[in-house]
Amino acid sequence: DIVMTQAVFSNPVTLGTSASISCRSSKSLLHSNGITYLYWYLQKPGQSPQLLLYQMSNLASGVPDRFSSSGSGTDFTLRISRVEAEDVGVYYCAHNLELPYTFGGGTKLEIKR
């Protein structure tokens, strides 16, 4: 199985500044077709996870372009520019390169008070 690894907490960020969340996979998620099968989800408090980005860098419908993702085959970064209070929650990376699809343990976005 492919193991997705994330830090439990982000570095605390101030509202209005940028945040970065990292994810590492134990196997390259770059397919021979050129697609990287890496996904990012956000689970806000009391809600189900929502898809943010698919195939590494494509924004899901309705997701603001403050969110972006980049990376290599195994190391990925989710970037949030101009962090807002509504961005608080747990961010998960996941893959669907091959079965079983697996998720990282999640990274909680910490806001400086």
Swiss-Prot record:
GO BP: any one term: adaptive immune response
Gene Ontology CC: immunoglobulin complex
Keyword terms of this UniProt record: Adaptive immunity, Disulfide bond, Hybridoma, Immunity, Immunoglobulin
Location of region: Framework-4: 103-112
Pfam families reported for this sequence: V-set
Region (Framework-3) residue spans: 62-93
Chain's role: Anti-streptococcal group A carbohydrate antibody.
Record keyword Nucleotide-binding present: no
Ranges for region Complementarity-determining-2: 55-61
Region described as Framework-2: 40-54
InterPro entries on file: Ig-like_dom, Ig-like_dom_sf, Ig-like_fold, Ig_sub, Ig_V-set, IgV_Light_Chain
Protein name as catalogued: Ig kappa chain V-II region 17S29.1
